[in-house]
Amino acid sequence: MSGTLALTETLIGRASVTPDDQNCQHLLVERLSAIGFECETIESNGVTNLWAVKRGAAGKEGKLLAFAGHTDVVPTGPAEQWSSAPFEPTHRDGKLYGRGAADMKASIAGFVVASEEFVAAHPQHRGSLALLITSDEEGPATDGTVKVVDALEARGERMDYCVVGEPTSSVRFGDMVKNGRRGSMSGKLTVKGVQGHIAYPHLAKNPVHLLAPALAELVAEHWDEGNEYFPPTTWQVSNLHSGTGATNIIPGHAEVMFNFRFSTASTVEGLQSRVHQILDKQGLDYDLTWTVSGLPFLTPRGELSNALEKAIYDETGIATELSTTGGTSDGRFIARICKQVIEFGPLNASIHKIDEHIEVAHIEPLKNVYRRVLEQLIA
């Protein structure tokens, strides 16, 4: 059994349902300290975070390449629906099954072993390497990576390159990397009416009827054209609620929750302003609160993307695709202190599902891609 596979299995065996790390990071600290990493644990509201750095010969003058990952996993769902126990790593049909196998314990194991091999082969490596690991990525993500980034920013520390170990491969291992992500902004809209008997509408004011024209306009609105890296911005309703459950009462208010996934072609302020304009045009009496979960970020082609593309091609023979599709990731926080952030990891078809798995044959190539990137950029 390879060292990467063994470490992946050990990590899967720890039931680190968010935000519980289950001492996964303690295991990583043992491995990393043994090869010269300085390890710092940053805890916040029950969340465990790790910042581990191994300085190169050039010290702080050299480039720093970091790996970002998360030890927490999503809940398993009904355990009885799994073909094998979700926290007992199980081999079947050439696959390794277990919660976190693809998202993202194999990636963490791959980078740790890649680091061990890299340091052994290049004991005088010029650049520095680091790992930023959290147990709060699958949850609210308020006490995880963002807290480490806050601490690093306060100390004036930056990264030159960051590889996030998210499972980005789509159909074939290595076929896609993420060089950016859309921003995410949610709104909670409450439209006020006047409650009354449904037989006497002239004595009431139905907030659903008042809301409907504005809702139709928001649905039909063309927010932007996108750009060469991002698709057009989207607006979607996630929740719609009004009424008491009775059939003879006109409700007193209607509540809508919605979400923008937006590109660098739009801004938070611009989108918020346009929503308010549409609501105000309809003369609505409303309250609207906003939550910005993350801003869009983009890493144009450069040293990191070139190194990763070459590493993937040399290892797999695949010309990978740069993409910004999908949801948000912790890359949105890291982009504050790192100009080159790219995500790469295994196939994502089974993540968050019953019987999550990774192809065993992909585990060593994953580690090898990470090592090739280290060798190109900081050896």
UniProtKB/Swiss-Prot annotation:
Which pathway does the UniProt entry assign to this protein?
Amino-acid biosynthesis; L-lysine biosynthesis via DAP pathway; LL-2,6-diaminopimelate from (S)-tetrahydrodipicolinate (succinylase route): step 3/3
**Subunit (UniProt):** Homodimer.
* Active site, UniProt feature: 72, 137
* One Gene Ontology MF term: acetylornithine deacetylase activity
Q: Keyword annotations for this protein?
A: Amino-acid biosynthesis, Cobalt, Diaminopimelate biosynthesis, Hydrolase, Lysine biosynthesis, Metal-binding, Zinc
Ligand binding (Zn(2+) 1): 70, 103, 166
PANTHER family assigned to the protein according to its UniProt record, in alphabetical order: ACETYLORNITHINE DEACETYLASE, N-ACETYL-L-CITRULLINE DEACETYLASE
Please give the biological process terms from Gene Ontology that the record holds: diaminopimelate biosynthetic process; L-arginine biosynthetic process; lysine biosynthetic process via diaminopimelate
Q: What does this protein do?
A: Catalyzes the hydrolysis of N-succinyl-L,L-diaminopimelic acid (SDAP), forming succinate and LL-2,6-diaminopimelate (DAP), an intermediate involved in the bacterial biosynthesis of lysine and meso-diaminopimelic acid, an essential component of bacterial cell walls.
Keyword Zinc annotated = yes
Bound cofactor: record note: Binds 2 Zn(2+) or Co(2+) ions per subunit.
Q: What is this protein called?
A: Succinyl-diaminopimelate desuccinylase
Swiss-Prot/TrEMBL cofactor(s): Zn(2+); Co(2+)
Q: Which reaction does it catalyse?
A: N-succinyl-(2S,6S)-2,6-diaminopimelate + H2O = (2S,6S)-2,6-diaminopimelate + succinate
The UniProt annotation places Zn(2+) 2 binding at 103, 138, 352
InterPro entries tied to this protein: ArgE/DapE_CS, Bact_exopeptidase_dim_dom, DapE_proteobac, Peptidase_M20, Peptidase_M20_dimer, Peptidase_M20A
Q: Which CDD domains match?
A: M20_DapE_proteobac
What protein family does this chain belong to?
Belongs to the peptidase M20A family. DapE subfamily.
Instruction: Write down the PROSITE patterns for this protein, in alphabetical order.
Output: ARGE_DAPE_CPG2_1, ARGE_DAPE_CPG2_2
Any idea of its EC number? 3.5.1.18
Q: Does the keyword Amino-acid biosynthesis apply?
A: yes
